[in-house]
Regions:
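Hydrophobic alpha-helical transmembrane segments
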Residues: 1-146
Length: 146
């Protein structure tokens, strides 16, 4: 958590925090490399679940296409899976210290973002967590039995 917070606070490219920020950003990239990919895989699996509110096929397609559409190697992993699952276009230009910074979009612009998407993404996240818990319990069971 400390590494992530440090990256969020000073990891951006800024003359004042250049050396400290670069260290925080690179450390965050290393520490979160595997968890970001596991989380994206769980989100894609969750999107294939029951109901028609998510698209597992599009989650996988957008993940493959847009997972590196961010300066950090980890940030767009789950964002791409989520954008595809919900048929949304996320990210894009951002404002830092009053300046607009051009950034790539993640996902296809198939529909506008709406308030109900907060509920939808929470369902997707809960499904992802349950799948992750089941996989951990199965791994624990296998290790315990063998």
């Amino acid at each position: 958590k400390a590494v992530n917070t440090m990256d969020s606070m000073v990891g951006y490219k800024n003359e004042r925090y250049l050396n400290f920020g670069r260290t925080a950003a690179k450390l965050d990239d290393v520490v979160n490399y595997i968890p970001a990919r596991i989380s994206a895989a769980l989100m894609i699996a969750a999107a294939y679940g029951p109901g028609k509110q998510f698209s597992g096929k599009d989650a996988l397609r957008i993940f493959k296409r847009d997972r590196y559409n961010h300066a950090s190697p980890n940030s767009a992993q789950t964002e791409a899976a989520c954008a595809g699952a919900l048929h949304l276009c996320l990210a894009g230009d951002a404002s830092y210290f009053g300046k607009i910074v051009k950034k790539p979009f993640i996902g296809d612009d198939l529909r506008p973002v709406e308030a109900e998407d907060i509920v939808r993404v929470n369902v997707l996240l809960y499904r992802s967590a349950v799948i992750g818990e089941i996989l951990c319990l199965l791994a624990l069971l296998v290790v315990t039995l063998f």
